[in-house]
Swiss-Prot record:
GO MF term (any one): ATP binding
Function in brief: May be involved in DNA replication.
Disordered as annotated region, ranges: 1031-1057, 1082-1102
Keyword annotations from UniProtKB, A to Z: DNA replication, Early protein
Family the entry assigns: Belongs to the asfivirus F1055L family.
Induction summary: Expressed in the early phase of the viral replicative cycle.
Biological process terms in GO annotation: DNA replication
Domain of life: Viruses
InterPro entries: P-loop_NTPase, Replication_origin-bd
Name of the featured protein: Putative helicase/primase complex protein
Amino acid sequence: MQETFKFLRSNSQGEAVEDKYSLETLKNHFVIRDEYNNLFRVFSGRDDFWKWEAAQPFEQKCFHEVVFGFLPQRLKFDIDFPVNKSYSNDNVDDNVDDNVYNILDMIINVIMDVFYETYSLPYNINLTREQILLTDSIGLNKKRELKYSFHIILYTYSVLNNNEAKAFTSKVLENLPKHIYPFVDPQVNKSIQNFRIIGSHKKGSMRVKMFNEELADVFETSMTTKKSDTLISTPFETTCLPCILTNVKETTSSSCDSIQQSELEEVLKFAGTLCKNHCFLRVYKNLVLFKRTSPSYCEICKRMHDKDNTLILRVTGNKVYQHCRHDNKHSLLMGSLSGTNNFVETYVEQVMSKSIEVHESILFEELPDTQKHIYDESSMREYERVPTLVVKAQMKIGKTIQLRNYLQKYYGNDSISKQQTIRFVTFRQIFSKNIQTRLPNFTLYSEVTGDLDSYERVIIQVESLFRLTSTAEPVDLLILDEVESIFNQFNSGLHKYFAPSFAIFMWMLETANHVICLDANLGNRTYNILQRFRGDVPIFFHWNQYQKAQNDMYYFTSSREIWLNNLLKDLLEDKKIVIPTNSLMEARLLQTFIQKKFPEKKIGFYSSKSSAHERESHFNNVSYYWGLIDILIYTPTISAGVSYEDKRFDVLYGFFNNMSCDVETCCQMLGRVRELKSKCYKICLQGKQNYFPETIEDIEMFTLQKRDTLFQTISNHQLSFTYCKETGRPIYYKTPYYHLWLETMRIQHLSKNHFITRFINQVADTGAKVFILTGEKLETVKQYTSIKMEIKHQDYVNVASAETIDANKALQIKQNLKEGITVDQRDLFAYEKYKLLEFYAWHGNKITPKFVEQYNSFMTKQNYTGRVQISRGKTVYESLTMLQTQELNFHQWAMQHAEHHDLQFNYSFQSHMYAIMLLTKCGFKCVQDPNILTNEQLMTKLVDEFVQYDLSAVSFEFKLKKPNKMDPQTILKFINKVLGLRYGLKIHHNKGNYYIKNTKAGSLIPFVRQPIKQSPCVVSNLLPITESSSTKEEISSTKEETYSTKEETYSTKEETCSIKEEISPIKEETCSIKEEISPIKEETCSIKEETSSIKEETFTET
């Protein structure tokens, strides 16, 4: 039985469905739209409709189900692919069917992922592909062109109404890749929705909506052919899903925090052996999804799964859990992410259980068999005579002995090649001297003056390569021992004559008849450099896999207290201890701490603070000097080239963090004492989570982007950019140093992002056994911390009370430090004082220890520089343009004269541009805007400007974690981190209002209109921003610490604030010494007083 109507909604003519039926009575009827006859038909039930439909002629079957929004309904998706369009993201696949199917598969996966997050995790409601119904209407359109259309229906579930369906659909659309989003119709959940019925087609088209068994087989979706399963208005047999609009609290918990790219590598390691049957698919919010490659046993369900992508890893807080789509009541804890208190211990457990692959394959291993010699023996085999030989083996297996045999065989007294030129390049002076003792027929560069080219066999350190010259004939043999460290040294910033040194190095590398590279920690950087610059000759890889460290035992912890108390116990038992650390402050702390507790013990202490004379004399005779001591403490000052062979020391205690040198250098430090009686190493690892770009592509993009913005014109309103007509787009010259620099940055960033996992992996890969260091947490740490404060305070006192020197003496001290000449400790403090006074233009003023503590800090200096740069002009936009011009001029000079200056320079324009953009989007006009925003005003701004805004570029620039959620409070927290780093400002909340306020560091360096005598300040040229009359009184009562409110016009004297930012393009000292940076930023200070890229707070590590 049916009734027909011309209209759906009432039009007062009695011809509409609404005229006869109420919404309540329609619940028990089935309504369709007859497109062919332009009518609405109301049936008493679905069965009546199907009987009637079967009797209609094919050309008139143009029926659409009318879905009323207030009624329960199935979740549905309308997918439509336009004709004559390529659907692959990279446009590489010409097979349209495959492209369409690949995209359709991706859409189904995203639907399942959103369902899992929305319903499976909180409510344990599962969705499999067999519960998804897929129909198609593929065929020719009116223009005789092939068109693809699909409907996806979750036929076993229903939602309460169209608003719930709309909310779920929106979540799916948010998580689709941008190139797929347009194919999904977002408007299929209206309050009254027409949805085509199975077996029907559009009027004038022969594309019929139908079941497709072949399609269901491809996508493993439901094989049902039951017509009622395709209807949207649901019968009672479906399961009604919980409401996601009313249960917001349950579905927006912290578990939805997204996984950062830099965290993904750690998360994937927890998959371990699971990846034998699965491969990584993608990340969805806080879920890592996998694609099944073969059947596997599920530890959660305790049975085999042979289809469906069941494996999911979920990250909640710092915990990583394993889930199965078939059972959401249970999960397995896999471990914890780095940057957390127990991550070290958790990760060691994973390594001990062999569920993590510790070996990091390198590109050399992928060379064909004819280009590699791999074996496992306790001593080295003879080296091959090939143009490019690369040797990898652990320490103490005889690499140098076999090299000596190689030289004797091919370059010995009886060899016809004895007159040919050999250059042995090292990365440290002390290593050069060590090598000469083993190769006495070589000339050491430091023992001769003048021309080195006349010597056939020369051992030379990289920073002295300028003493060589290129000739018509290439060198016959170039030896690069510790090759990875040699590449690192070119980024040290210590080269006095960088350009000629690097040019000679590249000339030898490219033209030498034979090259031998040796390193125990060989990596992809060496492979890529050799391929790029010696690609015309094949590489031969000689690898002895023998694990000499298989009897060594490493005990790891993240607890300083446990580590310290183990150390104290061993000292009480009168054991001889070795303590390497990559933190100067930690080394000084340990020295003082041990001296106070064990005054009778003799301590050897070596750092860059040690005098040049002491280092040279002791390192050349460690057998004698280290034989006199009970405890040896050293920083990266001691690395390769210094080796103690005697069995004197019992155990090694290492303390390392990710704020200093890379993992490879730290591991090298462990081997300076070759023989430990106990073969026991106890290591404390600490490191916060960092977010540095870690692929060559990302680093290059980030580097070029910072320079790219220098060529653009700033819009005063929305900080948009266009390219300057005068300068055009920049042209980048990708020189050999550029490629080496990119490779080195990649390694440094990997260490900063994944320091703990890479450290443990590299140790375990040597064959050493790894364990968790256990013990009690006693009160020792309080005394330790107290000593730390004493050391820091004494340093402040020493600087404040040091002699006040002039610029000439400061320059002399600086030159002595660069040239390795011993500088008296008093002069070092005087030089530190001079730099501090010079930085703030504070000469002639008396300073106190408190002044040194506050103003010699990393954050205060960074904020001061930022404030000076942004307040030069009358507006922030004028200031940005001035800074842009200054940095553009430097960049253009550097690209023409000395590229390494450009790559090592810290361009700050882009960081200012982002910071000001964030501030203005919040509704403030500049850094000195005194106005107040109400809570409603700011929240509205944050929603309108940022909820759909991608903050990836900003987080990339400031090395901050991208916000997990884009709600107003999370966005504001992120913005305040940026403003705090750049200017020492924050958007502060008080009594329902928001205004700009100083941070603790920012309050030390106020913006003023005229210089003040009380403290360093920033004389700002920014024109005053007029306060709104309604907020003046509030500002005066709540912002007493903020900006001066004098009415005088800002001084326009640029010379007052142009102190330190003007970087001279001829200065070679752009990079600070990277050695021994403390993990606590207050504890170190760079010698780069000319730049704003100060790394730490306290004293120069030279």
